[in-house]
């Protein structure tokens, strides 16, 4: 009857709690929702029946704006259910006297009647309705969740709690038969101290677990377990905090007098994400010998061999101590001393296969691009060579056509008839309307020692050899540039260590000057950059030089022993041919190149070389070989040898001898005849002789050139050392046209043309005299 009365009171209290509205005092002063709290222990009825849960008084609500929590009910004398929170501290019973009395009463009843079970079911239903009311009053937490949450039913935990109820110790049986309490575990972020409203409330986890404390038999336990499962499935949803969640936990415990003390929330800590299990199973983290993961400490720590493969230290050490002392992966020889311990926590290979593939593609593309550029350059070079060759062949065809048209006339006329024609031409018999008039004088070197001149038509400048103007600071010899456009001299360009004996400009390469010196070298100097671009060492003093007019890349250098060295400007090391002197080994005082097929009377091309004793014509063959022809000149006394390419004439100068008391300049016409085998024999025939002064101490260079009148006549200019003048002759008539006076003996003569005006320059040791044809 006592049990039935107790059950009836419980049911009445439950119904009363459902119908009674919450008092207005429950509202929080901060605006937060008031939570239900169990009544204190002194409200329990005299029959020992609890009054179930009543609204908590207003003073229980935290004044620091912390959300009010559900407080556990005090210890009652009804052995109904046991509510626990797994993983948290157990709320101890503060009133052992009531529990002891109920324990003694409950020891006598080991079986629960059907009415008691029905009362328990009603009681649990009331708890579920209270839980629904709490959920209705609780604000939505979907927008205030701190971290990822998950729900988990703790059915197994409640069953373990029921199973352990029958095995309690004696100290556990001293507890109250009705050991029911609530513990709401919430984790919340730190709240501001200003206000508290429904938005700041952020519950994270809440557990409500009902367990049985009865010592009944197995049937009652099973029946009671079903009731608990039904209660949990209907409303007791447990929220737990996951590993990545950052939260703080509040615990509420029950003490004497019904007061509650909330535990302060622990500081929030961010825990790093644990590595996934799949990373531990990767092949790169396991030893290939034992197929287990290596460690960063201990006897199985990460180690490597000289070949680079990774193993555990214990495994590879045991492996190498055996008979097979090779790497388990690549079979390379290894020793125990080759083991190297790697101090690394983890290893992870970066996938660079795509990057390496792109690099290889880039290298391949660059290689193909370079190959294409090289092929393009080769094609351009071949095109240039073929274009030059085609131009030369076209020019030769034109010359051969002229030769064919005049062949009959040349066969009918005797040798020397052309000289008679020149002397009898009407233009040569009449007086010249124009003369050379003195224009200007330039001082080249105060110290003297100037020797030779050359004119560059592409740059419109005249270069004169001279010693260095600052011999103490920069000794040697060079050239001074004289602009013919404004008739002003410019800078000095140093070139050689000794006196310069020959200067010549290329007809194909712009501004490239060839110079020969007594310092055993020939040099190529660019006047566009004023720098020496190539130097050749001839081994002997070089007296003269010239360019090949049929092949733009070949040059000739006349040595002191009478030999001629042939150089290819594309070969920077040494000469490609050497033409040995045929007779006397005397210095080559002059070299002049006569291009092939320049005239129908003499179609062959080659270099004319004049020494102090004789002269030779080196015929150039198609394979760039040279065949010598000794010219029939007077023996001894030759000091200069000049050519005129258009008319195929040459001018040979002799010094005075016992048979001739003055300087003689003989105009020669180049000729040829065929021998029995059909090979040509080159020779020359005298046309006119021009006489000068009786003195010849200097090797004066004379000039033979076309008349500025462009009438086909040829002019000859010779130097006269005795009179300090330059004599201008008409080659057709042999008559003297002008006597150009200077202050010193003339050393070199150079005609040139600028802006359709013809000029003549004469060089002495210190000065240059400019004359204009007017």
Swiss-Prot record:
<dbReference type="InterPro" id="IPR037381">
    <property type="entry name" value="RFWD3"/>
</dbReference>
<dbReference type="GO" id="GO:0006974">
    <property type="term" value="P:DNA damage response"/>
</dbReference>
<keyword id="KW-0808">Transferase</keyword>
<comment type="pathway">
    <text>Protein modification; protein ubiquitination.</text>
</comment>
<protein>
    <recommendedName>
        <fullName>E3 ubiquitin-protein ligase RFWD3</fullName>
        <ecNumber>2.3.2.27</ecNumber>
    </recommendedName>
</protein>
<dbReference type="InterPro" id="IPR013083">
    <property type="entry name" value="Znf_RING/FYVE/PHD"/>
</dbReference>
<feature type="compositionally biased region" description="Basic residues">
    <location>
        <begin position="150"/>
        <end position="162"/>
    </location>
</feature>
<dbReference type="GO" id="GO:0031571">
    <property type="term" value="P:mitotic G1 DNA damage checkpoint signaling"/>
</dbReference>
<keyword id="KW-0923">Fanconi anemia</keyword>
<feature type="coiled-coil region">
    <location>
        <begin position="361"/>
        <end position="413"/>
    </location>
</feature>
<feature type="compositionally biased region" description="Low complexity">
    <location>
        <begin position="211"/>
        <end position="221"/>
    </location>
</feature>
<dbReference type="Pfam" id="PF23419">
    <property type="entry name" value="WD40_RFWD3"/>
</dbReference>
<feature type="compositionally biased region" description="Polar residues">
    <location>
        <begin position="106"/>
        <end position="116"/>
    </location>
</feature>
<feature type="region of interest" description="Disordered">
    <location>
        <begin position="257"/>
        <end position="280"/>
    </location>
</feature>
<dbReference type="GO" id="GO:0016605">
    <property type="term" value="C:PML body"/>
</dbReference>
<dbReference type="GO" id="GO:0061630">
    <property type="term" value="F:ubiquitin protein ligase activity"/>
</dbReference>
<dbReference type="GO" id="GO:0016567">
    <property type="term" value="P:protein ubiquitination"/>
</dbReference>
<keyword id="KW-0677">Repeat</keyword>
<dbReference type="Pfam" id="PF13639">
    <property type="entry name" value="zf-RING_2"/>
</dbReference>
<dbReference type="GO" id="GO:0000724">
    <property type="term" value="P:double-strand break repair via homologous recombination"/>
</dbReference>
<feature type="repeat" description="WD 1">
    <location>
        <begin position="495"/>
        <end position="537"/>
    </location>
</feature>
<dbReference type="GO" id="GO:2000001">
    <property type="term" value="P:regulation of DNA damage checkpoint"/>
</dbReference>
<keyword id="KW-0833">Ubl conjugation pathway</keyword>
<feature type="repeat" description="WD 2">
    <location>
        <begin position="539"/>
        <end position="577"/>
    </location>
</feature>
<keyword id="KW-0175">Coiled coil</keyword>
<keyword id="KW-0479">Metal-binding</keyword>
<dbReference type="InterPro" id="IPR015943">
    <property type="entry name" value="WD40/YVTN_repeat-like_dom_sf"/>
</dbReference>
<comment type="function">
    <text>E3 ubiquitin-protein ligase required for the repair of DNA interstrand cross-links (ICL) in response to DNA damage. Plays a key role in RPA-mediated DNA damage signaling and repair. Acts by mediating ubiquitination of the RPA complex (RPA1, RPA2 and RPA3 subunits) and RAD51 at stalled replication forks, leading to remove them from DNA damage sites and promote homologous recombination. Also mediates the ubiquitination of p53/TP53 in the late response to DNA damage, and acts as a positive regulator of p53/TP53 stability, thereby regulating the G1/S DNA damage checkpoint.</text>
</comment>
<dbReference type="GO" id="GO:0010212">
    <property type="term" value="P:response to ionizing radiation"/>
</dbReference>
<dbReference type="GO" id="GO:0036297">
    <property type="term" value="P:interstrand cross-link repair"/>
</dbReference>
<keyword id="KW-0539">Nucleus</keyword>
<dbReference type="InterPro" id="IPR001680">
    <property type="entry name" value="WD40_rpt"/>
</dbReference>
<dbReference type="InterPro" id="IPR056527">
    <property type="entry name" value="WD40_RFWD3"/>
</dbReference>
<keyword id="KW-0963">Cytoplasm</keyword>
<keyword id="KW-0863">Zinc-finger</keyword>
<keyword id="KW-0234">DNA repair</keyword>
<keyword id="KW-0862">Zinc</keyword>
<dbReference type="GO" id="GO:0005634">
    <property type="term" value="C:nucleus"/>
</dbReference>
<dbReference type="GO" id="GO:0002039">
    <property type="term" value="F:p53 binding"/>
</dbReference>
<feature type="region of interest" description="Disordered">
    <location>
        <begin position="95"/>
        <end position="116"/>
    </location>
</feature>
<dbReference type="GO" id="GO:0008270">
    <property type="term" value="F:zinc ion binding"/>
</dbReference>
<dbReference type="InterPro" id="IPR036322">
    <property type="entry name" value="WD40_repeat_dom_sf"/>
</dbReference>
């Amino acid at each position: 009857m006592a049990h039935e009365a107790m059950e009836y009171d419980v049911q009445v209290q439950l119904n009363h709690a459902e119908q009674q509205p919450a008092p207005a005092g429950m509202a929080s002063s901060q605006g937060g929702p008031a939570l239900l709290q169990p009544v204190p222990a002194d409200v329990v009825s005299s029959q020992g029946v609890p009054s179930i849960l009543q609204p908590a008084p207003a003073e229980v609500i935290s004044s620091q704006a912390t959300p009010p929590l559900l407080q556990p009910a005090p210890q009652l004398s009804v052995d109904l259910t046991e509510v626990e929170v797994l993983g948290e501290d157990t709320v101890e019973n503060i009133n052992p006297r009531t529990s002891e009395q109920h324990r003694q009463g409950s020891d006598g009843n080991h079986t629960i009647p059907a009415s008691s079970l029905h009362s328990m079911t009603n009681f649990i239903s009331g708890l579920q309705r209270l839980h629904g009311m709490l959920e209705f009053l609780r604000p939505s937490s979907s927008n205030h969740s701190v971290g990822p949450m998950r729900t988990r039913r703790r059915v197994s935990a409640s069953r373990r709690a029921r199973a352990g109820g029958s095995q309690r110790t004696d100290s556990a049986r001293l507890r109250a038969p009705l050991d029911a309490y609530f513990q709401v575990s919430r984790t919340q972020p730190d709240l501001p101290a200003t206000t508290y409203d429904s938005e700041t409330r952020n519950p994270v986890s809440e557990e409500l677990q009902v367990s049985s404390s009865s010592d009944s038999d197995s049937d009652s336990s099973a029946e009671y377990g079903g009731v608990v499962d039904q209660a949990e499935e209907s409303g007791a949803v447990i929220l737990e905090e996951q590993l990545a969640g950052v939260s703080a936990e509040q615990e509420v415990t029950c003490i004497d007098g019904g007061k509650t003390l909330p535990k302060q929330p622990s500081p929030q800590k961010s825990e790093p994400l644990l590595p996934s299990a799949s990373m531990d199973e990767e092949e790169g983290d396991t030893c290939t010998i034992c197929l287990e993961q290596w460690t960063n400490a201990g006897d199985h720590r990460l180690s490597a061999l000289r070949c680079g493969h990774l193993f555990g230290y214990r495994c590879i050490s045991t492996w190498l101590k055996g008979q097979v002392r090779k790497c388990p992966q690549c079979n390379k020889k290894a020793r125990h001393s080759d083991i190297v311990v790697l101090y690394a926590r983890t290893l992870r290979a970066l996938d660079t296969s795509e990057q390496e593939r792109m690099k290889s593609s880039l290298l391949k593309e660059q290689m193909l691009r370079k190959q294409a550029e090289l092929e393009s350059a080769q094609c351009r070079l071949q095109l240039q060579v073929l274009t030059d060759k085609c131009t030369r062949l076209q020019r030769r065809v034109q010359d051969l056509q002229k030769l064919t048209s005049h062949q009959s006339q040349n066969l009918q006329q005797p040798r020397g008839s052309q000289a008679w024609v020149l002397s009898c031409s009407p233009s040569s018999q009449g007086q010249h309307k124009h003369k050379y008039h003195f224009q200007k004088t330039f001082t080249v070197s105060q110290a003297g020692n100037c020797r030779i001149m050359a004119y560059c038509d592409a740059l419109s400048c005249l270069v004169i050899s001279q010693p260095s103007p600052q011999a103490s600071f920069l000794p040697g010899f060079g050239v001074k540039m004289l602009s013919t456009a404004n008739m002003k001299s410019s800078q000095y360009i140093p070139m050689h260590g000794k006196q310069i004996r020959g200067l010549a400009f290329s007809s194909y390469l712009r501004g490239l000057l060839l110079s020969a010196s007594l310092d055993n070298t020939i040099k190529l100097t660019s006047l566009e950059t004023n720098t020496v671009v190539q130097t050749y060492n001839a081994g002997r003093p070089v007296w003269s030089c010239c360019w090949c007019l049929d092949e733009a890349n070949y040059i000739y250098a006349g040595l002191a022993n009478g030999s001629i060295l042939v150089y290819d400007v594309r070969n920077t090391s040494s000469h490609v041919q050497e033409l040995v002197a045929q007779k006397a080994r005397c210095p080559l005082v002059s070299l002049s190149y006569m291009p092939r097929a320049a005239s129908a009377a003499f179609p062959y091309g080659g270099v004319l070389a004049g020494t102090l004793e004789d002269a030779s014509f080196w015929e150039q063959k198609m394979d760039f070989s040279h065949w010598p022809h000794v010219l029939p000149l007077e023996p001894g006394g030759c000091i200069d040898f000049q050519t005129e390419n258009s008319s195929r004439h040459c001018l040979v100068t002799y010094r005075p001898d016992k048979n001739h008391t003055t300087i003689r300049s003989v105009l020669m016409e180049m000729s040829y005849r065929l021998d029995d085998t059909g090979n040509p024999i080159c020779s020359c025939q005298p046309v006119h002789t021009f006489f000068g002064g009786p003195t010849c101490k200097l090797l004066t260079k004379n000039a033979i050139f076309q008349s500025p009148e462009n009438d086909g006549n040829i002019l000859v200019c010779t130097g006269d050392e005795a009179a300090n003048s330059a004599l201008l002759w008409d080659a057709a008539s042999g008559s003297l046209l002008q006597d150009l006076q200077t202050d010193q003996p003339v050393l070199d003569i150079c005609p040139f043309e600028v802006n359709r005006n013809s000029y003549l320059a004469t060089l002495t040791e210190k000065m240059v005299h400019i004359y204009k044809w007017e």
